[in-house]
Amino acid sequence: MSEAERLAAGDPTLFAGSTAATALGWLRHSSAYGGPWLSTIEARLPRRHERTLLVGMGGSSSPARMLSRAPFLTVLDTSNPDTIAATEFDGATLIVASKSGTTVEVQTLMAHALVNGVEPEDLVVITDPGTSLAALGDWLGATVILADPHTGGRFSALSPFGLVPALYAGWSVTELAELQDANQLDAGVVERALARAAAVEIVDGVGQLDVGGDPAANGTALWFEQLIAETTGKDGRGIIPVPGAGPGPGPSEILELHLAAAWLARQLGVDPFNQPDVERAKRDVFVRLMPDARDQSTPVAGVASLGAVLDYPGYHTLQVYGPLSAGEQLAPLRAAVAARCGTTTANLGPRYLHSTGQLHKGGPAVGVIQVVLRPASAPRRIQGRGYTFHDLHRAQADADLAALVSVGRPVARVVADTIDEVLAMVAALG
């Protein structure tokens, strides 16, 4: 068999590492989740409200951002207290999406929503079989939809994680069935994917790929950025997804891009389906949320100055911990850093922890500027927790800062009230 035929057949021995044997379910999603499945699911969904909120991170929410047709669906992929304070939960359907069922942002926002107006009968849970989230959803009387456990989050756009939110985002069953038909696995889509991967120039284990838009403000670019960064960025190698002018890929190219990303990882000799460095900061978050740690607020050691990081000769990334509305404001800041430093990417925290965070810590060396915007809202204690959203948001920033320092990344932190203040700091350093 040729390599293309082996890929179409789902041969796990094509890939480095040991995860492929249980991670190739996405190759059959277009058939498994076609018209009959969509019709059955549509009949189960609660439809009491016009507004729908989706709580999810990484691959559990980025497909929804790509497919969303505003204003039908609002995606809350954050722990930012200002965004949460500004969100009206009463009178909305809530979709809670998490493969593992243990994602901290999802758990805390779900708890918050259920005591701030969301009724269990208006709750839709999307998760893998056997998770604690599935059990909780059943106990609450929510609509629980089980996903494919043999598919990683970033490869789940054509599964329930992408399709169910799309049904709330203006797509009809017929339109989604046609989308699945356009993404059927055949020889043509495999050949196009291999050609797309072959077109990416890779030098010493590093390449760049235009994602066709600004991931901080464009849902399709955000989805594509995660797919490339998390699939390839490990073992010191990786493809850097860079903002582009567009047009980006369309929904009919989802399977082709899944295949191309996996093949790029094969060319780099890395496991396409693991994300070893994503867990690095997650573990430290919970340590920092312990009462003693919150009270001490110990600074992260080893942090560099802004000037030193701007002088770093490699590529740069901006990690901005602020409200979701700040995503629209990142382009001028990214452009200012790029004018001085060259290739620069930017996105919001903690969103990036579930996507490009793998690339930042596991991929090619990068200069990191972490921006923390001071929340304007009053602290809000999370239902059933001993900490607030302010505590969680800052703990996530601190944990990733420490993780970046621990792997030798040059990283600076800037604390400010607005993006304009940060722009002024960059300008002052010439």
Task: List the predicted regions and their residue ranges.
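Gly/serine-rich nucleotide phosphate-binding loop at the start of the catalytic core
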Residues: 1-11, 291
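Acidic catalytic cores of enzymes that act on phosphate-bearing nucleotides/polynucleotides
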Residues: 15-49, 65-67, 171-174, 185-280, ...
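Glycine-rich phosphate-binding loops that contact phosphosugars or nucleotide phosphates
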Residues: 46-187, 247-248
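Catalytic-loop motifs flanking and including active-site residues across diverse enzymes
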Residues: 63, 156-160, 224, 256-260, ...
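A generic structural motif
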Residues: 75-78, 120-128, 146-152, 231-246, ...
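Glycine-rich, charge-decorated loop segments at or immediately adjacent to ligand/cofactor-binding or catalytic sites
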Residues: 126, 130-142, 347, 353-361, ...
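Short, structured coil segments at secondary-structure junctions
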Residues: 139-141, 340, 407
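C-terminal amphipathic alpha-helical interaction region
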Residues: 312-313, 317-318, 346-350, 390, ...
